[in-house]
C-alpha cells in the first residue's frame, strides 16, 4: 500500500470513528412554543416545524414595517403548507409572551480553532463590541467559551457590556496545546472536539423554550474533505446519519447559528476561508455525504444564520449578527410524518415582493 493510499485509508477510518462518536441521534423534543392561541388546543403536537425568520430587503437591510401572517407563505419541498401559528417580534414594540421568552444570545469564543497569534486582536474587538454605547447592548448576551475544558457558558445574560467584559477579562484563556505539527491526528482531534461541543450545546438548549442565537467566533473547524479522503459506502452512511443528527439537533433546540471569523482581512483573497461554500448544498442521500457538510459555516448558513469573514471590524460583524434579534417572525407548520428512511425537505418561505426571508433552508424527517 503506497503512502497516498495509507493516508486515504487512515483518514477514512479515523474520521468516521470520530464523527460517529460525536453526535448521537436526538430523540428529545422541545416544548412547542406558544406562538398564538391556535397552538394551545388539546391536539397540539410536538412535531411542528418552527421557523424563526428574519426579513430584509434585497440589499440585506432590515425593514421597519411589521408584516402580518398574510404576507408569508411556506413551501415544503415545493408544496404549499398551511401556517398553523404565527408571531411577529419587532424589538420591544411587541410584548413577549410568558411561554416564549426573549431570544437567548450566546457569544461563543472558540479557543480550540483560533490560532494564538489572533487571540490578542480578537480580545480587543470583543472588548470594543461590549463597550459600545457606554456598555449598553441592544439585547441581553451571555458569554461562552470553547476550550480544552469543553463548553462553558455564563449562567446569566445581561445588556451591561461592562459586566460581560469583566467576566471576559477574568476568563483564563485555555488555548489548546499546539498541535500544528501533529498532522492529521491533531486535525481530527480538533474536529471531534468541535462537533462534540456543538452537540453538547444543542442538547442542553433543546430543553429550554424560545429562540436561541449562538454567535461562534471562529475561523471554523477542519473540513477534513478533499481528494485524500475517500469514504466507503458504509462510512458515508455513518456520515449521513451524523449530518442528519446535527441538523436535527439545531432545529429542535431552535438554534440559529452564526460564525464570525476573527482572522480578518488577512486571508480575504485566500480560497481557504470560502472553501466551505462547496458544501452548502444540503445532503439528500448518503452517497454524497462529506465531512465538509458539517463545517461551522455550513451549519450556520443552513440554520438561517450568517457566516461572516474577511473584515478587520469584528465588532461590526458581531453587531450584524445581533441585529437579527431586533425584529423577526416565528411561524409553524405541521409537516407530514416520514414513511421511510431519513428524507430531506427543502423549506422556502416567501414574503411580499421586494423582500427576502432568511430562515432554516430545510429539515430531515425520520420514520
How would you name each of these model-derived features?
Residues 28-367:
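Scaffold/interface architecture of coatomer-like assemblies
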Residues 4-5, 21-22, 28, 32:
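Intrinsic disorder/low-complexity segments
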Residues 8, 15, 360-362:
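Small/flexible residues
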Residues 12-24:
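Bacterial N-terminal signal peptides
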Residues 1-10:
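N-terminal secretory signal peptides that target proteins for export/translocation
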Amino acid at each position: 500500500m503506497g503512502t497516498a493510499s495509507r493516508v486515504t485509508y487512515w483518514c477514512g477510518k479515523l474520521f468516521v470513528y470520530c464523527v460517529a462518536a460525536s453526535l448521537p441521534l436526538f430523540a428529545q423534543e422541545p416544548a412547542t412554543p406558544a406562538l398564538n392561541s391556535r397552538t394551545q388546543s388539546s391536539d397540539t403536537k410536538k412535531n411542528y416545524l418552527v421557523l424563526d425568520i428574519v426579513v430584509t430587503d434585497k440589499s440585506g437591510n432590515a425593514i421597519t414595517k411589521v408584516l402580518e401572517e398574510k404576507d408569508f407563505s411556506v413551501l415544503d419541498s415545493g408544496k404549499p403548507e398551511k401556517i398553523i401559528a404565527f408571531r411577529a417580534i419587532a424589538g420591544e414594540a411587541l410584548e413577549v409572551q410568558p411561554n416564549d421568552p426573549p431570544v437567548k444570545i450566546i457569544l461563543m469564543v472558540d479557543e480550540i480553532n483560533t490560532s494564538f497569534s489572533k487571540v490578542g486582536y480578537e480580545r480587543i474587538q470583543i472588548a470594543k463590541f461590549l463597550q459600545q454605547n457606554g456598555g449598553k447592548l441592544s439585547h441581553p448576551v451571555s458569554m461562552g467559551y470553547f476550550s480544552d475544558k469543553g463548553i462553558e457558558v455564563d449562567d446569566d445574560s445581561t445588556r451591561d457590556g461592562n459586566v460581560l467584559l469583566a467576566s471576559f477579562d477574568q476568563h483564563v484563556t485555555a488555548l489548546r496545546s499546539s498541535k500544528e505539527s501533529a498532522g492529521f491526528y491533531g486535525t481530527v482531534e480538533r474536529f471531534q472536539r468541535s462537533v462534540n461541543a456543538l452537540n453538547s450545546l444543542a442538547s442542553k438548549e433543546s430543553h429550554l423554550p424560545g429562540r436561541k442565537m449562538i454567535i461562534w467566533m471562529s475561523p471554523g473547524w477542519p473540513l477534513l474533505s478533499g481528494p485524500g479522503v475517500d469514504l466507503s459506502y458504509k462510512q458515508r452512511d455513518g456520515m449521513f446519519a451524523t449530518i442528519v443528527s446535527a441538523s436535527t439537533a439545531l432545529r429542535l433546540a431552535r438554534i440559529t447559528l452564526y460564525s464570525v471569523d476573527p482572522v480578518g482581512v488577512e486571508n480575504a483573497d485566500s480560497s481557504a476561508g470560502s472553501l466551505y461554500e462547496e458544501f452548502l448544498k444540503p445532503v439528500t442521500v448518503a452517497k454524497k455525504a462529506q465531512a465538509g457538510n458539517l463545517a461551522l459555516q455550513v451549519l450556520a448558513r443552513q440554520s438561517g444564520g450568517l457566516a461572516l469573514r474577511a473584515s478587520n471590524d469584528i465588532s461590526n460583524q458581531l453587531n450584524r449578527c445581533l441585529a437579527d434579534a431586533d425584529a423577526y417572525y416565528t411561524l409553524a407548520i405541521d409537516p407530514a410524518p416520514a414513511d421511510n428512511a431519513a428524507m430531506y425537505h427543502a423549506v422556502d418561505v416567501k414574503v411580499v415582493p421586494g423582500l427576502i426571508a432568511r430562515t432554516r433552508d430545510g429539515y430531515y424527517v425520520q420514520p
